[in-house]
Amino acid sequence: MKILSVLLLALIICSIVGWSEAQFTNVSCTTSKECWSVCQRLHNTSRGKCMNKKCRCYS
């Protein structure tokens, strides 16, 4: 039971820290496809996602 609580705590800490290294932009979008060129231009990566009508780039 102790191990389970330690694992749960570790999972929560990892979720809070946000190790995804996402970079937010102020560019409006409706689909993730629109973010690919924006992320390439701004952050030199083609991995982007449209979240809450804003582009979010991942490194």
From Swiss-Prot:
Chain spans, region Interaction with Ca(2+)-activated K(+) channels: 48-55
A Pfam family of this chain: Toxin_2
Record localization: Secreted
Annotated Gene Ontology cellular component terms: extracellular region
Gene Ontology process terms (BP): defense response to bacterium; defense response to fungus; killing of cells of another organism
GO-annotated molecular function: ion channel inhibitor activity; potassium channel regulator activity; toxin activity
Disulfide bonds: 29-50, 35-55, 39-57
Signal sequence region: 1-22
Residue(s) at site: Aromatic residue of the functional dyad: 58
Keywords linked to the UniProt accession: Antibiotic, Antimicrobial, Calcium-activated potassium channel impairing toxin, Disulfide bond, Fungicide, Ion channel impairing toxin, Neurotoxin, Potassium channel impairing toxin, Pyrrolidone carboxylic acid, Secreted, Signal, Toxin, Voltage-gated potassium channel impairing toxin
SUPFAM superfamilies found in the cross-reference section: Scorpion toxin-like
Annotated site residue numbers, Basic residue of the functional dyad: 49
Tissue specificity annotation: Expressed by the venom gland.
InterPro entries according to UniProt: Scorpion_toxin-like_sf, Scorpion_toxinS_K_inh
Residues modified as Pyrrolidone carboxylic acid: 23
Comment, domains: Has the structural arrangement of an alpha-helix connected to a beta-sheet by disulfide bonds (CSalpha/beta).
Protein function: This toxin inhibits numerous potassium channels: shaker (Ki=227 nM), Kv1.2/KCNA2 (nanomolar range), Kv1.3/KCNA3 (nanomolar range), Kv1.5/KCNA5 (Kd>100 nM), Kv1.6/KCNA6 (Ki=22 nM), KCa1.1/KCNMA1 (IC(50)=5.9 nM). It blocks channel activity by a simple bimolecular inhibition process. It also shows a weak interaction with nicotinic acetylcholine receptors (nAChR), suggesting it may weakly inhibit it. It also exhibits pH-specific antimicrobial activities against bacteria (B.subtilis, E.coli and S.aureus) and the fungus C.albicans.
Additional notes on this entry: Negative results: does not or very weakly inhibits Kv1.1/KCNA1, Kv2.1/KCNB1 (Ki>2 uM), Kv3.1/KCNC1 (Kd>1 uM), Kv11.1/KCNH2, KCa2.1/KCNN1 (IC(50)> 1 uM), KCa2.2/ KCNN2 (IC(50)> 1 uM), KCa2.3/ KCNN3 (IC(50)> 1 uM). Does not inhibit the growth of Gram-positive and Gram-negative bacteria.
Sequence similarity: Belongs to the short scorpion toxin superfamily. Potassium channel inhibitor family. Alpha-KTx 01 subfamily.
Name of this protein: Potassium channel toxin alpha-KTx 1.1
Organism: Leiurus hebraeus (Hebrew deathstalker scorpion)
